[in-house]
From Swiss-Prot:
Upper taxonomic lineage: Bacteria, Pseudomonadati, Pseudomonadota, Gammaproteobacteria, Vibrionales
PROSITE patterns xref list: NUDIX
Substrates-to-products reaction catalysed: isopentenyl diphosphate = dimethylallyl diphosphate
Any single Pfam family the record assigns to this protein: NUDIX
Gene Ontology cellular-component annotations: cytoplasm
Active site: C68, E119
Protein name: Isopentenyl-diphosphate Delta-isomerase
Binding site for Mg(2+): C68, E88
Keywords assigned by UniProt, alphabetized: Cytoplasm, Isomerase, Isoprene biosynthesis, Magnesium, Manganese, Metal-binding
């Protein structure tokens, strides 16, 4: 099945659609979302990170947020987040209304293979203490709960371990969680 992305302008207004790979080849601004699930433990918050599969056409073998993708045409980002949690890691217990939508940011980054990310990226979070998962090997090679300390340590020591968008997503999530606690 050919996948399409929703092209947007700098204000976030939809202006068309394009095949996903072509949009990444041309570096055109399009809608995306990043889901980051977290849980509270006795030692603090932990975040569920995925390691992107070796077969992904960009950012392969990089640690990133729980899941990320692009909403389909006329698909709400929270519904898309729920859909991709199921498709990527087999999580079915998170409903669209459980997400807190932190809004969006725009970023652009050159990737390997001559591709470019240029996304209006919505950040969706949910506190999910008890989730089970089944990895889709075409999407994800590993999944782990990471403490704040472990993420910070790895981002300082080995920043290339993570996808280019993850540090921004993570910092925005931390800022939000610190403000509400």
């Amino acid at each position: 099945m050919t996948e399409y992305v929703v092209l947007v302008n700098e204000q976030g207004d939809a202006i068309g659609t394009m095949e996903k790979l072509e949009a990444h080849e041309k570096g055109l601004l399009h809608l995306a979302f990043s889901v980051l699930l977290y849980r509270e433990t006795d030692l603090g918050k932990e975040f569920l990170l995925q390691k992107r599969a070796e077969c992904k056409y960009h950012s392969k073998n990089k640690w990133s947020n729980t899941c990320c993708s692009h909403p389909r045409v006329n698909e709400n980002v929270e519904v898309a987040g729920t859909r991709r949690l199921n498709e990527e890691i087999g999580i079915t217990g998170v409903l669209p209304e459980q997400f807190v939508n932190l809004g969006w940011f725009i970023y652009q980054a050159e990737l390997e293979n001559g591709l470019s990310e240029h996304e209006q990226d919505y950040i969706l979070i949910a506190n999910t203490p008890d989730v089970s998962f089944i990895l889709n090997p075409e999407e994800v090679s590993d999944i782990q709960w990471w403490s704040e300390a472990d993420i910070e340590k790895e981002m300082k020591a080995n920043p290339d371990t993570f996808s280019v968008w993850f540090p921004t997503v993570y910092k925005k999530v931390l800022t939000h969680l610190q403000q509400v606690n």
